[in-house]
Structure formats: C-alpha cells, structure tokens
Amino acid sequence: MPDEGAAGPPSSAPAGGGAIDVVLATRNRARGAERAARAILAAAYPSSSLVVVDQSDDSTTREALREVASDPRVSVIAAPPRGLAAARNLGVASTAAPIVAFTDDDCAPAPGWLEAIAAAFAGDASIGVVFGSVVAADYDRGAGFTPAYRVDRPRTARTLARKPSVEGIGACMAIRRSTWRALGGFDEQLGAGSALRAGEDTDFAVRALLAGAGVRETPAASVTHYGFRAWDEGRATIEGYMIGLGAVHAKMLRLAGPAALRPIAALAWRWIARGPVVDLNHRPPRALRLAAFLRGAWTGWRAPLDRERGHFAAPRR
C-alpha cells in the first residue's frame, strides 16, 4: 500500500480544506454509476481525483461512463468481481490525497459534501474515520424501503466503548490514508460481494478505534440514496446486513476481549431490534434478523483471523 506521498493523481483543495480524493465502486449499475459520478464531480474540489472501480460483468458501465471519464479528474479501473472492500482498497491505492471519501453507485452526494468532510477532519489529526448522513430519495413506502442513516448532530468516539454512538454506513464515509495504511485497508472478507455480505465499514471503524484513531459523525456531509428495495428484496438485504454485522461483532470480541462486550451488546441489540428499516408494518421479523446475526457471528468466531492485521484470512482455494 502506498505512502501518503506515493505517486498518483495530484490532488489539492482550496485554502483551509484538506486534499480529498473520491473512490466509487460499482458493479452492473451503469445508470447509477453515471449519476453518482456526475454528482461527485459536481461536489468535488477542482483538483480532486475520482477513481471508479468497475467490477461489472461486461463493458456496459464503462461505456456509460465514457463522457464522465473524459474529465481529467476521473480514472476508471476495470477489476475482477472481488467485492466492495477489495474495490475500495484498489481505489485508495490508486489515489494520493491524505483523505479519501466514498459513496455508493446508487447514491449522489449533496453540494458541499467534501467541504463538510474536510471540516470534520480539520484540526484533529487523531480522527481516522468520518461518517455522514445517508438520506433516502422519495419512494413508495407501501412498496418497499430505501436504507438510510441520519446523523442529527456531530459526535466523536475515541474508544471502543463509545462505538455505539457513531454507527455510520459506508455510503457516506471518509478515511485518513494513514489510518487505512495502518489497518492494512478494508477487510476483503467482509462487505457486499463477499461471503459475509456486509460490515466492512463497521469493521474498519472498530479497528480504527482499537488502533487509537477517532471516529466522527457529521450531519453536514450527506448523500442521497436511490437504492430502493421492494419488500422481498429488502428481506435479503437486511439478512445480509445481519450476517456481516454478526461476523464483525465476533471479530471485535476476538480482537478486544472483554472490552468488547458492552459495545457488542449495545450495537447488536440496536440492529437486531431496530434494523435499518423504519416501517414497523413491513420490518423483517426480529427472529429473522437474530438468526442471520447469529449465523454471521458463528462464522466470524470460527473463521481464521490474522490478529496482527485484524483481517479475516482469505479462504483456501
């Protein structure tokens, strides 16, 4: 993984703001990726880089991004479908700025997104991770739901015990490159496209706290989420969330020991009882969420773990 001064696309920001590059991972969402990329460029500093890591099955997404990619700030990298965490690691390795922001290919950042992220990092070199709000676009609440996460006020966690106060999700997330390097990047056995299906964002924040970095939430940074799920699809989505989070919590216990018990109890109960869906009439049954969480926790407890890096070991082929 590169040092902060490693070669890559140049990046600078207006006076008073830290240099920030953006990584967008995408797979088989040509229209969404184009919308996200255009919104990112509209919200980005003139000298920020945007790296799109495309794990699509064909060239449709790259063709949709052809006009966007004519902007000298944009690079599109075709990559094998190894999952979201791997895509984000590749994207970070392909940038140079000391801060890297992420959103998803079904999201669009609001104006001022990067300025808000820069402000959240400014003046405190101990902050390693920043999360913002993920606001659902308008949708038919009778037909399904769109996952969302609203930050109502600034919060900072500096210890594992405070992790339940800053949940955050990776659709509006930024990291300090030095933290990414220190942690060995995102755990590629977690997240969308992996066997454990989710949790790479939560896991990164947990490991950052264990390494002594702070995790901050800011309501000033936000993205709009267009990822509507019909109820049947939503059940599978939430099941995936629970499996990933179960694995993350099991890993937390293995890495931190008894110090992890309190935050595990708080976070697990919050997600199992509430989950990311606010419509009580259609929420997947608590038993389904609990079963998925426990399945993920059992897998995470038994999976080979590289304790030095804090990553699950890749399965043997």
Language model feature labels by segment:
Residues 112-145:
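Conserved donor NDP-sugar-binding/catalytic core segment of glycosyltransferases
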Residues 168, 192-203:
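Acidic donor-binding loop at a coil-to-helix junction in glycosyltransferase catalytic cores
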Residues 100:
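Short aromatic/hydrophobic "clamp" motif used to bind/position activated sugar donors
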Residues 39, 46, 54-63, 107:
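A conserved acidic beta->alpha catalytic loop
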Residues 237-243, 254-317:
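Non-catalytic, C-terminal membrane-associated alpha-helical segments of glycosyltransferases
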Residues 28-42:
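Short, well-formed alpha-helical segments that are part of the catalytic scaffolds
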Residues 132, 147-166:
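Short, flexible, basic/aromatic active-site loop/helix in glycosyltransferases
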Residues 36, 79-95:
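Glycine-rich, basic loop-to-helix element that forms the pyrophosphate-binding segment
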